[in-house]
Amino acid sequence: MACARALNSQTDMTETEAREEICRVGRSLFERGYVHATAGNISVRLDDGFLITPTDACLGFLDPARLARLGTQGNQTGGDRASKTIALHTRIYAAARKFDAGTACVIHTHSTHCVALTLNAPGDELLPALTPYFVMKVGHVPLVPYHRPGAPEAAELVAQTIERHGAAGTPIRAVMLERLGPNVWHESPAAAMAVLEELEETAKLHLLTGPAKIEPLSNEQIDELRRTFGARW
């Protein structure tokens, strides 16, 4: 189901189609175990505002008509009460679009393996360059220190992190909130979901190796991925 549709730009969608796509992606993530209970949220940027999943909603059972609708300034204009993370989402859009103008979807989950890695003080980034597809499809995933869910300080740190990496010439598509979960973004819900899946599966792979020392890809191997596939690492 994850690859059932092409990863079309969100600008090709009407609001009705965007509502349906949020629900389709949420259901897919839930049914395949990438989200659980009422953890996680999905938003889409529209020309005149945003759609976001309601607070405490299960992503597997979303109703397109009940998604929260917000104006360009984040004021709610319709639907059920918006997720408390809307401020974080809007900061991500503002920062990420400086380097990826097509950014139109943000997904946040409490992905088990990603969160597990944050419990062992991994450093400034969640994962090293373990596999070629992690480098190509995800890229650097900076770790943001723990803040309570919805804390404005976390949103500020995330925005600063996105802008710092972008200014350095390595734009990112994901950050990891310590003990909470990843935020990923791309030009459509399907494309953002693909980033999330690759991130969580790489975290799982890392944990499966146990305490063994893992050698990441070499600088030469990463350079080859940059030259061949345009990897942003």
Q: What spans do the regions from the language model cover?
A:
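Glycine-rich flexible loops
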Residues: 11-233
